Amino acid sequence: PERSDGEDMLELFQNVAHKMDLKTAVERGVLVPIRCIRVKTNIDLTDVRINGIKYNSQDLESKLFIPERNQLIVDTYLKYVNGKKTVIFCASVDHAAEIAKLLRDNGVNAEAVSGRDRVEIREKVLKDYETGSTDVLCACDLLNEGWDSPHTTVLFMARPTMSKTIYMQQLGRGTRRCPGKDDLLVIDFVDNANMFNMPYSLHRVLNIAKYQPMAYVLAPENKRKLDQDMLFKGEKPEAWLDVPIDVDDYEIIDLFNWQNSVKDMISQIEL
């Protein structure tokens, strides 16, 4: 597993008995297939300062903590996945608290969780999510690693990051299997950026250029083929039936990544 602190797991364990990447694990059925919806915002990140490959936290929060973007997150939940077990990754602790409040104002059982919370409060929030009394968890960095819930079926990537490691850690919070869970839906919030401060998205992190709303991004070959056959006929796969999306929509994504050109000059901790 990739770690944000840059620690090399081989230093601890020396020998690797078995190694499997995300793509292989999904294709072999170890992890659930992954679908994606990209939601474009009108937020401009081009003048957000960066340090290595980290956004300046104050710049980022000032860009993202605005009513219009927050409402877009809430509206997206209500429109596409209302009632589904969802984790929303937010830009800051205050941002997470605001999104949770807006969701509650719209009748959604949502809570924010952060490292600022007392241990007993944090444990109760996580337990309520596990037992079903809470449908949505809004978090900043607390849930990036060391926690997951197999019941999570939707991830909102509402916190831009230029770190592939952080994005993959967040993605891992929803990929585990459990009874009744057919796949994971990732909703990427796509803000405007230039080629040198562009955040990761599911397609960019997996180096997949073609995007079609709700289509499989990763899946076993037989499931992917079944979906594509239905799309070719102009029909919606069963998983799409309740989602108001036009099956003809598609997009080619710019996969340029300047980090690949300078990776030898940037520490693994930053990547």
Question: For each of these PLM feature ranges, what is it?
Answer:
Residues 1-37:
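Post-DEXD/H (motif II) to motif III coupling segment of the RecA-like Helicase ATP-binding lobe
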Residues 61-106:
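Conserved strand-helix element at the start of the C-terminal RecA-like helicase core
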Residues 162-182:
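Conserved SF2 helicase motif VI
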Residues 19-32, 50, 176-233:
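A conserved SF2-helicase RecA2
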Residues 29, 137-155, 171-176:
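SF2 helicase motor core recognition
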Residues 87, 96-104, 108-144:
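Conserved helicase ATPase core of P-loop NTP-dependent helicases/translocases
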